[in-house]
């Protein structure tokens, strides 16, 4: 099973003239593979987020040139399934990955090549656990975003809420944030507020009575959050979408 040449990466890594650095291109494309493979495997959103986070964290600790990023990605999916108690068979991960890279190809036979790949995934999982010092449980923004959306829905005019897909957009922004390493650079609560902030900005939705309030709506959700933090997260999100247009 051959992976295509890597491309796309975390928004923080930019090369000359603002172009994505080579490492960033690889990580973006591999994260996209994790998400698409995860969907085909029937993974829930949290296990997929965990797989992406494990992948990004591993390469924060190691050199990209030393490891096959797609093998690391497959092992991340396998490990995330264990961490989030949605266990996956290595055979299914291999078959889905093979179909991803070879859409018109035949399923892999249970031959020596298959068993070598299976053993590589298992051995790679053990390597990753050691590199990450067995710290593979993460706090994701999802539960915070759900809480914030419920609160915001109660604040907003019902008509405004129903005619604009703020919630759908916020969830999409959160999902796409895992193409980069935002999950490692920012607190989960801050990311949840930032994607909600950006979703409101996209549709021009204003929170009622914000002008008269003692503090902005987003600080009600999180006292230690500042506007520069939101701006940094939003900037990284925008760079992710910019990178998406640059990478086939």
From Swiss-Prot:
- The answer to whether UniProt assigns keyword Acetylation to this entry is yes
| Superkingdom of the organism of origin | Eukaryota
GO molecular function list: cyclin-dependent protein serine/threonine kinase regulator activity
Region described as Disordered: spans on this chain: 1-21
Q: Which SMART domains match?
A: CYCLIN
Residues with PTM N-acetylmethionine: 1
The processes (GO biological process) annotated in the record are: regulation of cell cycle G2/M phase transition; regulation of transcription by RNA polymerase II
Say if the entry is tagged with keyword Transmembrane: no
Which disorder is it connected to? Toe syndactyly, telecanthus, and anogenital and renal malformations: A syndrome characterized by anal, genital and renal tract anomalies, facial dysmorphism and syndactyly. Features include anal stenosis, a rectovaginal fistula, clitoral hypertrophy, a pelvic right kidney, toe syndactyly, and telecanthus.
Print the miscellaneous field.
Silencing with siRNAs phenocopies CDK10 silencing in increasing c-Raf and in conferring tamoxifen resistance to breast cancer cells.
What subunit structure does UniProt give? Associates with CDK10 to promote its kinase activity. Interacts with SALL1.
Purpose: Activating cyclin for the cyclin-associated kinase CDK10.
Put simply, this protein is called Cyclin-Q
Q: Which organism was this protein described from?
A: Homo sapiens
């Amino acid at each position: 099973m051959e992976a295509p040449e890597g491309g796309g990466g975390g928004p923080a890594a930019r090369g000359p003239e603002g172009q994505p650095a080579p490492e960033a291109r690889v990580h973006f494309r591999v994260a996209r593979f994790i998400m698409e493979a995860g969907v085909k495997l029937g993974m829930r959103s949290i296990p997929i987020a965990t797989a992406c986070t494990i992948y990004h964290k591993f390469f924060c600790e190691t050199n990209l040139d030393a490891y096959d990023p797609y093998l690391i990605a497959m092992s991340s999916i396998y490990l995330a399934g264990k961490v989030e108690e949605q266990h996956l068979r290595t055979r299914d991960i291999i078959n889905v990955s093979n179909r991803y890279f070879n859409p018109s190809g035949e399923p892999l036979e249970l031959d020596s090549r298959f068993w070598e790949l299976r053993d590589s995934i298992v051995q790679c999982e053990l390597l990753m656990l050691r590199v990450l010092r067995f710290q593979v449980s993460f706090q994701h923004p999802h539960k915070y975003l759900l809480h914030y959306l419920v609160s915001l829905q109660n604040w907003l005019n019902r008509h405004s809420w129903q005619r604009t897909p703020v919630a759908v957009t916020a969830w999409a922004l959160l999902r796409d944030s895992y193409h980069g390493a935002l999950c490692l650079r920012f607190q989960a609560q801050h990311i949840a507020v930032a994607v909600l902030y950006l979703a409101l900005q996209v549709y021009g939705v204003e929170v009622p009575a914000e002008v008269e309030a003692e503090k902005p709506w987003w600080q009600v959700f999180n006292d230690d959050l500042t506007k520069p933090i939101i701006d940094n997260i939003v900037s990284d999100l925008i760079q992710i979408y910019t990178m998406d247009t640059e990478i086939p």
